[in-house]
Every structure is written in C-alpha cells, then in structure tokens.
UniProtKB/Swiss-Prot annotation:
Pathway: Cell wall biogenesis; peptidoglycan biosynthesis
Function: Cell wall formation. Adds enolpyruvyl to UDP-N-acetylglucosamine.
Catalytic activity as recorded in UniProt: phosphoenolpyruvate + UDP-N-acetyl-alpha-D-glucosamine = UDP-N-acetyl-3-O-(1-carboxyvinyl)-alpha-D-glucosamine + phosphate
Gene Ontology terms describing biological process: cell division; cell wall organization; peptidoglycan biosynthetic process; regulation of cell shape; UDP-N-acetylgalactosamine biosynthetic process
Active site (catalytic residues): C117 (proton donor)
Protein name: UDP-N-acetylglucosamine 1-carboxyvinyltransferase
Residue numbers binding phosphoenolpyruvate: K22, N23
Gene: murA
E.C. number: 2.5.1.7
Similarity section: Belongs to the EPSP synthase family. MurA subfamily.
Length: 421
C-alpha cells in the first residue's frame, strides 16, 4: 500500500485547479442509466470511486466510452444484467445509487448492500422505503437488495424522509423521473450535489422543481433522452486546499471553484483570521503569515457547516491560537483522526460528539494511519504544519476523494511525496 511522506513547516503559496465533485459525479453517472440515448458526462474527477462505478457499468454490460479528457459517454441500451455484484459494491457505498434508476428504467434490480467509509451507521432503509412507496416490491436477502417494479412501472408517491439523506434523496428523485404521475419528496437533502444531479436530469428531459429546497416535486415523464453535462466543482476539495493554506500561514488561489457552495466554510475561515476574495469561479485565501485563531463549529446538513470539512477544521484548531469546540451532529464515530493527531502532539479532548481542541505552537511529525477519506485529508493538513517528517499510511482512503493530492500540494510548495508500500 502506498504511503505519503510529508516534511512540514513550509508556508504554502500558489494556484491550483479544482476537480469535479465526486459526490456529484457518482449519482450523475448512475442517472445515465435512465436515458434511452447516449449521455456524456464531463469534468469527472480521476478517482478510484469513479473507476469503480465505470467498472460496475462494464460488469452490467454497459460499456462506457472514455475520451482523453476523461469525459464518459454511457449508452444504457446495451445493459445485459441488472445485478450490481458485492465485490464491486463493497468498496463504494455510492453504488446503491444504481438501484433507483435500474428499477425505474428496467423494472428490476439486484444490488449488494454497500461498503465504503467506516463512519457509523448509514442505513439504506430510506432508499428501500422510498421505492416501496412508489410500488416496488423489495426483499433483502443474502446481502442483496432485490427490487421489482409493479406491473406498469413505478408510481409517483408522496414521501417524507425521517432523516435528511443525500443519497436517499438522489435515489428516489432519479426513480421518480420515470414514475407515473407526481412525486413529492419532503425533508429532502438540499446539498449542491443534489441540485447538480437535478440539473443533469432536467437536461435529459426530466421535470423537477424545488431542488435545493427541502421539498422536491417530480412529474414523471415517458422517457429521458441523451444530454451532455458538466459535473460541478468539488466544494470539499476546495475547502481542504483553503484550509491547507490557512494552517501554514500561506496564500492560495483555487480556480474552477464555486464560492456559492462554500459559504459556511468561508465564514469560518474568515473568523480564523483569513483574508478571502472571491470571483465567479475562483477563491483566494491569504493568511499573511499569521497563525489562525481557533473557531467553534457545529456540523449539520447543507447549508450549515459540512461534516466533510469537520476533520480539516480540527487540524486547523490544533495549531490555532485559543480553544475551539467542534460538534459533529451528522455521523457518529467520526473523530478517528483525533487519535492520530494526538500522536503528533495535538491537545484534543473528545466527549461524545464533541471535540475540544486547544491549539499548540507546533505539531511534531510522526507515523500515522488514515482511517477514512476526510480523516486522512486532515492528517495531511496536520503534517504540512508539523515539525519534521510525517509518514501517512493507508492513503488509498485519500485517493478515493482527492485527485492527485501530492501533485496539487507540490504546486503550492509543499514537501510531499508518495512512496510505494
């Protein structure tokens, strides 16, 4: 397994381009199964999860065509099997997203119960109950979800999500595009990635209103046609590089970004003492060599502070002036990075869903281990400002969500290299 070796203490300075959003690209790829003509998706990030989704399509008989710019054309008419097998699904939770489109378009699906990041219970029952409300018959047996549409296809339904679920909202919204009649999804996720998926579906001919609010209305149509669609910029990758500059007292300009999707994060960075300037598709952060100030934050569904930026801000607080409290309300068991940071000399106390972080002057390099995607990114940030060398193991977690992380950080001046395990 590859490792990263980072020599800390370098003030980052420079410009980088932001990749397409993984959390938007995966549902949008799943949505291509709904089309009865080829659909082309552009600005896909070059990530392991994307490769897994494309491999899953290949296993089902859909052979995506990939060009040199990593645009992917999918023609779902060539599908041969409606099974998403365990050996692919186990590595990536997002593979559950093919369930709704397959049942809606082909009348049945068999999808293995998913794997992915080990951060608490992320139940798939909302996906199942949403499809059942639309008339699907679903059995869970042998580790597989087996779903069948009623005769005549799925029917529009009024569905209330007990818990805000991004992938649940996406799956049911996709299924509803081809259902007969109107579907109303209440307490729906409002994330920008949900809006991006809705925009892609609309480009394919779907009738969707209210994406980005907590009530989404979908009027089913007979068919969805081909389209060409650009995936939105990755707001979590954007935030991570902004924090990287902030913790090192440096400056960064991120291009091909979307400031409107990051308001809660930008507000906290300003509170930490960063000077921030934005344009239509860029953000510049400058710490002017200063040490950040500790911030208090509480994660919650969009538009509040994103859980996927929590670990990065714990790294920021770890070297900030003062004490900051971080409350995690979205996932349980999401402070695994804290125990690795303690090995580097951080002063962090975890009580239930709260981490109390008192900043220290300097962290010290140490061997650490990545446990999940965002936790691993926070260890990279901690290493960038630590004294000496940090060796980060199990970085396949990082590769699931960050395209070319070492190359981008090298562009900003970081001393970072990948070594084979």
């Amino acid at each position: 397994m590859d490792k990263l070796i980072i020599t800390g203490g370098v003030r980052l300075d420079g410009e980088i381009r932001i990749s397409g959003a993984k959390n938007s690209a995966l549902p949008i790829l799943a949505a291509t199964l709904l089309g009865d003509e080829p659909v082309t998706i552009c600005n896909l990030p070059h990530l392991h999860d994307i490769t897994t989704m494309i491999e899953l399509f290949g296993r089902m008989g859909v052979e995506p065509v990939i060009d040199e710019k990593l645009s992917v054309e999918v023609d779902a008419r060539s599908i041969k099997t409606l099974v998403a097998p365990y050996e692919l699904v186990k590595t990536m939770r997002a593979s559950i997203l093919v369930l709704g489109p397959m049942v809606a378009r082909f009348g049945e699906a068999e999808v293995a119960l998913p794997g992915g990041c080990a951060i608490g219970s992320r139940p798939v029952d909302l996906h199942i109950r949403g499809l059942e409300a639309m008339g699907a018959q679903i059995d869970v047996e042998g580790g597989y979800i087996k779903a069948k549409a009623p005769e005549g296809g799925l029917r529009g339904a009024h569905f209330f999500f007990d818990v805000v679920s991004v992938t649940g909202t996406e799956n049911i919204m996709m299924a509803a595009t081809l259902a007969k009649g109107r579907s109303v999804l209440e307490n729906a996720a409002r994330e920008p990635e949900v809006v991006d998926l809705a925009n892609c579906l609309i480009a394919m001919g779907a009738k969707i209103q209210g994406a980005g609010t907590d009530t989404i209305i979908i009027d089913g149509v007979e068919r969805l046609h081909g389209a060409r669609f650009n995936v939105m910029p990755d707001r979590i990758e954007t935030g991570t590089y902004l924090v990287a500059a902030a913790v090192t007292g440096g400056r960064v300009k991120v291009k091909d970004a979307d400031p409107s999707t990051l308001e809660a994060v930008l507000a906290k960075l300003q509170e930490a003492g960063a000077e921030i300037t934005t344009g239509p598709d860029w953000i510049e952060l400058d710490m002017k060599g200063k040490r950040p100030k500790a911030v208090n934050l509480r994660t919650a569904p969009y538009p509040a502070f994103p859980t996927d930026m929590q670990a990065q801000f714990i790294a920021l607080n770890a070297v900030a002036e003062g004490t900051g409290t971080v409350i995690e309300t979205v996932f349980e068991n999401r402070f695994m990075h804290v125990y690795e940071m303690l090995r580097m000399g951080a002063n962090i106390l975890v009580e239930g869903n709260t981490a109390i972080v008192t900043g220290v002057e300097k962290l010290k390099g140490a061997p650490v281990m990545a446990t999940d995607l965002r936790a691993s990114a926070s260890l990279v940030l901690a290493a960038l400002m630590a004294e000496g060398d940090t060796l980060i193991d199990r970085i396949y977690h990082i590769d699931r969500g960050y395209e070319c992380i070492e190359e981008k950080l090298q562009l900003l001046g970081a001393k970072i290299r990948r070594v084979p395990g």
